[in-house]
From Swiss-Prot:
This is Probable cell division protein WhiA. It comes from Limosilactobacillus reuteri (strain DSM 20016) (Lactobacillus reuteri). One of its GO terms (biological process) is regulation of sporulation. Belongs to the WhiA family. Pfam families: HTH_WhiA, LAGLIDADG_WhiA, WhiA_N. Residues 274-308 bind DNA. The gene is whiA. InterPro entries: Homing_endonucl, Sporu_reg_WhiA_N_dom, Sporulation_regulator_WhiA, Sporulation_regulator_WhiA_C, WhiA_LAGLIDADG_dom.
Length: 313
């Protein structure tokens, strides 16, 4: 089972009261529903690839409207695609759709009732239904952080984004596959969204993974920084040693002032140590790190002068 399916499975087990159930059904039917006519009456079909969601729709219709629907399974053999589960309401579909306020001229309306947007818990329930109908979320252990909800209509997609942003989620929208999506890419916002639609256990699991990932990334950054510093120190040390050996081969270290000679000889004798450690090893020391660095820069400059004079000759 995918991570997104686990989140949805948790959501289908949430207990809700009538108004919240209606809001959830509004989203599920608006996004996955279609209307037909049989025996001179409306028939409602709500389609999903997730059996838990199909059972959820069936249960909500029975619990809050007292109607019996049926679940039709269409098995897809080609390319081993998932089965399709259709919750079909043959009787009382007109009553359910009228009560939900999503039927207009025998079509499902794109608009969301204004009164729903005024109630925080109904908005949460609508978002839960929208996620069940068209949502997905990446596994935080293996992928980049990403949660999205797909909608066929742009206006409805924008309404979902507005709902999400009522909770400060910074949701963004874009066109996708003959439809539109609203998406989140920030880990904290994804966790907040899962919490507000009721996926508490999934949110806690997500947060645990995020903490481990963040710690691992922090350690990696520290290791990379340390490696970069070590490389920088090694390169600087190599240059210092090359310059000291060059000076020794041309004029001899004994020709240097005592302070420069001491640091030069100490560096040759201790090529792997840091500047701080080098300052503690100088016979006339100890010398501060800045003092050691100052003397080594003088040696580097002197070596450059000697090379320049050779070029002129």
């Amino acid at each position: 089972m995918s991570y997104a399916s686990e989140v949805k499975k948790e959501l289908t087990g949430i207990t809700v009261h009538r108004d919240n159930a209606k809001a959830e059904l509004m989203a599920l039917i608006r996004m996955n529903g279609s209307i037909g006519i049989a025996d001179h009456q409306l028939v409602l079909n709500v389609q999903t690839e997730n059996p838990a969601i199909a059972r959820r729709i069936y249960s909500l219709l029975k619990q809050f409207y007292g109607v019996e629907s049926e679940i039709v399974v269409r098995r897809k053999m080609k390319l081993k695609k998932n089965n399709q589960y259709i919750v079909r309401l043959r009787y009382h579909a007109q009553h359910v759709l009228d009560d939900l306020g999503i039927l207009q001229n025998y079509q499902i309306k794109e608009q969301v009732p204004v009164e729903l947007l005024k109630d925080e818990w109904m908005v949460r329930s609508y978002l839960r239904g929208a996620f069940l109908a068209g949502g997905s979320v990446n596994n935080p252990e293996t992928s980049r952080y990403h949660l999205e909800i797909y909608s066929l209509y742009e206006e409805h997609n924008e309404i979902i984004a507005q709902m999400m942003n009522k909770f400060g989620l910074n949701a963004q929208t874009t066109a996708r596959r003959s439809g539109f999506i609203v998406y989140l890419k920030e880990a904290e916002k994804i966790a907040n969204f899962m919490s507000l639609i009721g996926a508490t256990n999934s949110m806690l699991q997500f947060e645990n993974v995020r903490i481990v990932r963040d710690m691992r990334n922090s350690v990696n950054r520290l290791v990379n920084c340390e490696n970069a510093n070590l490389n920088k120190i090694a390169n600087a040390s190599t240059r210092q040693i090359e310059n000291i050996e060059f000076i020794d081969s041309r004029v001899g270290l004994s020709s240097l002032p005592d302070k420069l000679r001491e640091i030069a000889e100490t560096r040759l004798a201790h090529q792997e140590v840091s500047l701080k450690e080098l300052g503690e090893l100088v016979p006339g020391g100890p010398i501060s790190k800045s003092g050691v660095n100052h003397r080594l820069r003088k040696l580097n400059a002197y070596a450059d002068e000697l090379r320049a004079s050779e070029v002129k000759q």
